Amino acid sequence: MEESSSIAMLVQEIGEPEAVLTAEGVLSPSSEVDQQRKAKADPLVHVIQKLSKIVGHEKSQKCLLIGKKRPRPSETANSLEKLENCEIPAKATESPAAGVRKTEMSQASSTLASNDGKAMSYQCSLCKFLSPSFSVLKEHVKQHGQQHDVMLMCSECHATSRSQQELEAHVVSEHENSASSQARSSPSGQGATERKSETMVDIPVNMGSPQTHAVQSAAMAESGRRKWYAYEQYGMYRCLFCSYTCGQQRMLKTHAWKHAGEVNCSYPIFENENEPLGLLASSMSAAPGGVDAVVIAIGDSELSIHNGPSVQVQICSSDPPSSSPLEQSTEEGVHLNQAVTLDANEEEMLEVMSDSEENLFADSLLSSAQKIISSSPNKKGHVNVIVERLPSAEETLPPKHFLINAEMEEGKSPSPSEAQTGCVGAGNMYHADKCTVDIGGLIIGWSSAEKKDSELSKGLAPDENAPPGRRRTNSESLRLHSLAAEALVTMPIRAAELTRASLGHYGDINLLDPDTGQRQVSGPLATYSKKIMSPLKNSTDGVTSFNQSNSTVVALPEGRQELSDGQVKTGISMSLLTVIEKLRERTDQNASDDDILKELQDNAQCQPNSDGSLLGSNVVEYIPDAERPYRCRLCNYSSGNRGYIKQHLRVHRQRQPYQCPICEHIAENSKDLESHMINHCKTRIHQCKQCKESFHYKSQLRNHEREQHCLPNTLSVASNEPRISRDAADGKCAQEGNKPSTQKQYRCDVCDYTSTTYVGVRNHRRVHNSDKPYRCSLCGYVCSHPPSLKSHMWKHASDQNYNYEQVNKAINDAISQSARVLGKSRGKPLLTSSEERTGPTTGSPENLVSSSELTSQLPGEVMDASELEKLNPTGCSSDVSGRSCSLAAPGTEYCVLLFCCCICGFESTSKESLLDHMKEHEGEIVSIILNKDHSTALNAN
C-alpha cells in the first residue's frame, strides 16, 4: 500500500496492553515485511491492498491501517514497533499542511516513549482526521471553513473544554489510574449545549480484547465491497469502477446506470448520508463483536459539511445482565445527547449500513429496490442496523426519553415484524423494543433471520397512535413508486406468485362491496396483487408483515381494530395511486365541460349518508365537516364527489390474468392480449378512396388527391360507393356494389350523408329536423366544432366502451361529408353533419369546415351508453349530433365554442354560467339519465 499522510488514533496505555494504531507510512521495516508476508497468506487482504493502490491517486481515500498488539513496551523502546494484528478502516486525507503533519508525526513518534508510555491524539469530528499535534488539527479545521473556536472533548468521559492544557490535565488526573479495557457506556453528556456552532475534537477509539484474524479479514472484505463510489474530502464523488468524478449527487445517480450490470453496484441513496454518518458506518462495520469502539459524529446546521444533526453511537461488548449498563438506562431513559448502547454477541460481526446497501454484492438496481419492499433480514448470524433520517430530523426538537429493553434472551434475535415501538405513556416517554432505537429523529433498527414461530404471533401494541418503527425515506419512496408503476403495468396479477398456504385469514372479504369492483376471490389475495397494505377498521384479523423472501404473515391480535397511520404509509403503491387520482381529478376539474352530468347525477340522486352500498362497505368513510368528505380507507385518497370516489375504488380491484388495463378486456393468453393492445396503440391510416394508397397524415392524402386525382384542395374525396336513397330513415340497408364484403351502407334521404350503421344515420337525420350541437354521449360535452369534439374524446380513451380509432374515423367522416355538401351546394346553406355512431368507415379524409352553433338536444332523444351498445355490435358508446346553419359566404370557416343546456337550449360562452343554469334542471337531468325504458322500444324498432 502507498504511504498515507494521515495518522490513526493513538490512545493512552494504562494498566493493560492496548493496540496502538498508526498510519502505514510510519511503520517500521519489520512491520512492513510482516504485513506483506501476511497479505500473501490471506488473499482477502491482498485484494484489498490492490484496490487501495488503484484508488490511492486521488486526494482522499479510505485505507486500511494495519498494526500489531504486543506486551507493553519499555520506556526506551519505540512504541511504533509494538503494534498488534488489528485492522480498522480510517479516512486518509491530504491537505496543504501535509508536510507540517509529517513533521509533527515524526516528532510525535519520537516522544511516544515519554510521559510514562502515554500518548494523545486529536481527531476532527467532521472528517475523522487524526493528528498528534493540536496545532496541526487547528490548521486542518480551517480547511472545513470553520472560523469558530475549537472545542475539545475527552473520548473517555466526554468532558469538554476550550483549553488544550485543561483537557490534557483532565486526562492525566482523571484517567491515569482507570482501566481502559471497556468503553464507558453512560457518558456524562456535559457540554451538550456547547456543541452548537462549534467544532468538536475527540479521542474516540479504544481497542480492548483481541480477535481472530479471520473475523478481521471478513470485516475488511465487507467494507471493501460495500460502496462502489467514494466521497472525497473536498466535495467530489468518485466512481471506483471507472474513476468518474462529479460534484453533485444527481450526476452520480445518473452515472450509476452505466454500471447497472455490476453486482457490486446499487442505486446510490444520499437521504441519510453525511460524512460523519458515513464514517460512522464504515468504522462500526469493521469493529468485531468484542471491540469497544466509541464513534462520535458531532456537527450542526452551521458547521457540519452536510448540515446533519449531532449523532452519538456507542457499541460495547457483551456483559452479563447483572453488570450490563443497559439496566441503568432502562431506569432513567437515554437522552439525545448521550450515547445509545447496543448489546451484541462477540461471535457476531456488527454491520451498519444504509437500507440500499444490504446484500450489495448480490443485488442489482431492481433487486435492491425489492429489498426495500420486503425488508428481508440479512444472512444468518449478522445483525443489520438500518440507519435512516426522518424528515423531522432537521427540526429542533426537545429531547425525548427512550427506554431500551435489555432482557434479550440468548439465541433469540428480534424479528422484523416486531420492529415497532409501543407507547407506554401520554408524555414523551416511549418504550422501544430490541429492534429500534430513536436518537433525535434518527432511527436505528436491526433484524435477524432467527426467530421462533411462537414469537411471530405476538401482536403489536394495541394503541393505534404508536409511533412507527420504520419509515421510508423520500428517496426510497420514489424508487418504490417507480417499481410499483412498473409492476402495475407489466404484471397483470401479483397474487398468483404467492402460495395460499402462506397467507393467513384476511378479515372478511365480503366487507368489500361489489360496486367497488373487488372480485370475490377464494383466498385473501385481495389487495396484495398490488402490494397494498389495506387495513379495515372492523376486521379482527389483519396482515401486519409481508416478507417476500419467506412469505411470512403475522396475524394481528383479536383486539386489534385498525393499523396505525405509520403502517399504512409503508405500502409501496398508496402514495403513487393517490398522486394519480389527484392528477386525474385535477384534470377533470380543468376540463371545459367534462363530467358535468355525472356530477349532477351523483350529487342530486343521493344524500351523503343514503348510499348504504358505498358507505356501509367499510371501504369509504364519510366525514361530514371535512372539505373532502369521502375518504378511501384502503389508501389516503379523498374527494368531495361520490362519483370520483367510486371511480377511484377501481384501482383496488384485483385484475384477472391477461386483462387489458385500459378497457378491462380479458384475453385468453398473452398473444391475444398483445393483439388486443394494438387496437389501443396503433396509428391512424388515411385511405385514399380513389385508389389503394394509404397515408399516415391528412396532408399527404390531400397532396396525393390533388396531384394524382386532380381534386380541388378545398374538397375532400367523395365516396364512390353506390348509395340507396332514403333507406336510412326507414331502417333499410343495401349491399355495397363495388366491394366484395358484406358491409351494409346507410344513407340519409335528405343529403348524401352515408354511414355503416343505422344509428349513425338516424342521429344525422336530426340535423334536418332540429338544431342540435355536437355532443359527447359519455359525459355531455357539447361543441359546434367537430375537431374540438375529436380533441375532447381523448379524455375517454380509457373507457371500456370506447374505441378512439373508430370514433375518430366517424368524426373525420362527418367533416368529410360536410365538405362534400359544401362542394355541391356552392352558396346554398351548408349542412354540417354530425359524427356518426362508432363503427368502421370506408375512409376518413377530412377538410376543416365547421360553422354550426350550439343548441340543445331534446330530453326524449337522449340515449345512454347501454342503449347504443345494444344497437351497435361494435360495443362503442359515443354519439354526437349536429345541426345546420348558414354561412356568410361559401367556404368561410367559422368556429365558436358555446356551452349549451341539454334541456332548454340555454347557451353561454361561460362554463360557470351554464353550471349555474343547469342547477335548475337537476331533477330532469337525473330522470333522463336514469330512465332506460325507452331502450326496449328502440331495440324493437
From Swiss-Prot:
Keyword line: DNA-binding, Metal-binding, Nucleus, Phosphoprotein, Repeat, Transcription, Transcription regulation, Zinc, Zinc-finger
Example GO molecular function: DNA binding
Zinc finger (C2H2-type): 122-144, 152-175, 237-259, 630-652, 658-680, 686-709, 746-768, 774-796, 899-921
Ranges of biased composition (kind: Polar residues): 839-856
Principal localisation: nucleus
Presence of keyword Metal-binding: yes
GO cellular component: nucleus
Biased composition (Low complexity): 178-192
Record PTM Phosphoserine, positions in chain: 95, 415
Disulfide bridges in this chain: none
Region span, Disordered: 165-198, 455-477, 823-856
PROSITE patterns named among the record's database cross-references: ZINC_FINGER_C2H2_1, ZINC_FINGER_C2H2_2
InterPro entries: Zinc_finger/UBP_domain (IPR050688), Znf_C2H2_sf (IPR036236), Znf_C2H2_type (IPR013087)
Localization annotation: Nucleus
Annotated TM spans: none
Protein family: Belongs to the krueppel C2H2-type zinc-finger protein family.
Function summary: May be involved in transcriptional regulation.
Name assigned to this protein: Zinc finger protein 507
Annotated organism of origin: Mus musculus
